């Protein structure tokens, strides 16, 4: 009878502990810059003094696919006596983005909460380029930047559609390229706008058409002058060499003819003597 009462008392205490134990999160959404560090935090309340030996805390990423994921979060155990389960992730990468489940077990009681981590990389550096289309009065304006998530590109006050494409870098970032081809009005400059919808961030770059424009190919008029010049120079050099050769042959023949009579006269004089 006493044993039964003890069992009932123990079970009642366990239910009370389970009812009192709760897990909360001070922050559900973390938006972190790519490459920086982050600490995801869960708070727990035991209702009394914390028994560190009875606590088990873990942070698990909720995967939507079957690909293996290496958990990179490290539990900061020095925070446990304060009722905090803090998980540190260094140098946040794109693959770290997603939803996480913070699970804390305290004896027979347990509870969990969800945390969401989003990664952003600002399109702060926009590279611009101006290209003159040969044999036309059109130009190609290019804006290119790298960031995350995928940004939208627009060209304000332009009715001509732009050709915008993107690719992924080895780090998982997006390299976005937008090309606009048009006949520019005199004295007008243009700008491209990168709008990152998920993090509500806007970046703008201006393009000055007065700056030096690079032709797509070498000017054809240079070829029209250079090639005939080379041909004429080659013909001139070949003609000079041929004339010089003929002149040398004539001079050699003239000297040979002059020497022969002198030799004959000498032979006749010797015979007479």
UniProtKB/Swiss-Prot annotation:
Biological-process GO terms, alphabetical: adaptive immune response; cell surface receptor signaling pathway; cellular response to lipopolysaccharide; immune response; negative regulation of activated T cell proliferation; negative regulation of interleukin-10 production; negative regulation of T cell proliferation; negative regulation of type II interferon production
Regions that span the bilayer: 221-241
InterPro entries per the UniProt record, alphabetical: BTN3A2-like_Ig-C, Ig-like_dom, Ig-like_dom_sf, Ig-like_fold, Ig_sub, T-cell_Activation_Regulation
Family that this chain belongs to: Belongs to the immunoglobulin superfamily. BTN/MOG family.
Glycosylation sites: 37, 64, 157, 163, 189
Organism: Homo sapiens (Human)
Pfam families listed in its UniProt record: C2-set_3
Protein name per UniProt: Programmed cell death 1 ligand 2
Cytoplasmic-side positions: 242-273
Function recorded in the entry: Involved in the costimulatory signal, essential for T-cell proliferation and IFNG production in a PDCD1-independent manner. Interaction with PDCD1 inhibits T-cell proliferation by blocking cell cycle progression and cytokine production.
Key words, A-Z: Adaptive immunity, Cell membrane, Disulfide bond, Glycoprotein, Immunity, Immunoglobulin domain, Membrane, Receptor, Repeat, Secreted, Signal, Transmembrane, Transmembrane helix
Gene: PDCD1LG2
Domain (Ig-like V-type): residue spans on this chain: 21-118
